[in-house]
Amino acid sequence: MRAPPRFDRRALLLGGVAASLWAWRGGAGAATPAPARRLTAAAASQALAPPPAAPTRLLAYEGTVPGPLIRLRRGEALALSLANRLDAPTTLSFPGLRIANALAGIAGLTQAPIEPGGEAEIRFTPPDAGFNLYLPDAGAATARQLAAGLFGPIVVEEPSPPAVDLEAIVVLADWRLDEAGRLRDDSAPAGALVTAGAAAAPQRFAAPPGARVRLRLANASATRAMTIAVDGVTPLIVAVDGQPSAPFAPLRNLFPMGPGARFELVFDMADAAVAFSLRDDAASAPDQPLVVFACDGAAKPARPEFAGLPANPLLPKEIDLARARRFELTLSSGDGAALAINGETLSEWSGKPQFAVRRGAPVTLALINATAAAQTMRLGGHVARLLHALDDGWEPYWRDVFIVPPSRTVRLAFVADNPGKWPIASATPASRAAGLSGWFQVG
């Protein structure tokens, strides 16, 4: 694969890790397990900290953290049941899938939560191919449930997946543990423990020179934004937040992942190992390898340059900015630990919508961060283009998770084509509970 062109990634900007992994080898497409038909959310134990620490009491789907991989092809119906065996209400949400509002799984906004001991049947057909996460969105219980391990990956395959030799699916998360290996109940932005499932990081693969690799990477952390550094190859980013993008190389081989972000990368093995590592510039610490692809085996013939994933035909090719409805949301600090949107500290989905538009209307939205910390915001039910500073163009990818640096403004544009009540809120449950809990109406 030739060295890919570099773009000005101004919109990617800034943005204890556990990595759990699924992998397939193959030609035109990965092996396709049957979609999970039942998920039970319940207490579980998993060894996170090294001995002599005891296994950590977690919350899990089907007893595993992350939960089971759900995999299906675009156009295939997903039918599953969720059993709540927790001590608090929960839901099952699929952010990024652009499904109908009534199926979004957002307690208090789109549905009632599933009470302890209850069950729910979930049926939908994802409209888009892509890589996303499933997780709870259960109001005040969300922060604890997500931080304790309730998350898992869902892959909706393209009708004709690109030919690769190895596909790896990695879900990252960080953990806040005390000295005995028990979960701490705090909202620190980063956990102290760095693990890879039940084993020490990094997760390791082996592939021969010339092998084409597709890596699907997600950040399931409840609070932590991560900077990922790549060594040994210049990969192509081919999808962001569940939607295909024009292929591009990450600037300086770094890319930021806010909580909930998903990236897909394609690269061809050379004659040395490839490492994806966690970079912590604030701590001046060495990069922490998370995923390593060792070079091993007989070389494979060179492949043609990767042309990218098929564009999503359901997304607009253009957004008419001239007739767009324009809105601004200012994120600010309130009293104590409170946060506010446009001067109002919002409880879960309270009050009036931040804005309301007709179905099909183009929208531009300015997210103005007047706080002293970066804020990660999520757009519900839709994906948006990141606009250039003068609204004179946009980046060649779609996003639903946006890192807004302190004292900066991020502008986005989208077509409001999914009816219902949707969040425009923090992707960090603790910040959402502190007041960054807005919503908008599409009718």
Name each region found by the language model.
Residues 1-19:
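N-terminal secretory signal peptides and thylakoid transit peptides that target proteins
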Residues 53-71, 194-204, 337-359:
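N-terminal edge beta-strand
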Residues 24, 29-42, 144-177, 245-374, ...:
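Extended terminal and domain-junction accessory segments
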Residues 65, 70, 96-128, 200-201, ...:
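Extracytoplasmic beta-sandwich strand-turn segments characteristic of Greek-key/jelly-roll folds
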Residues 126-156:
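Hydrophobic or amphipathic alpha-helical targeting/insertion segments
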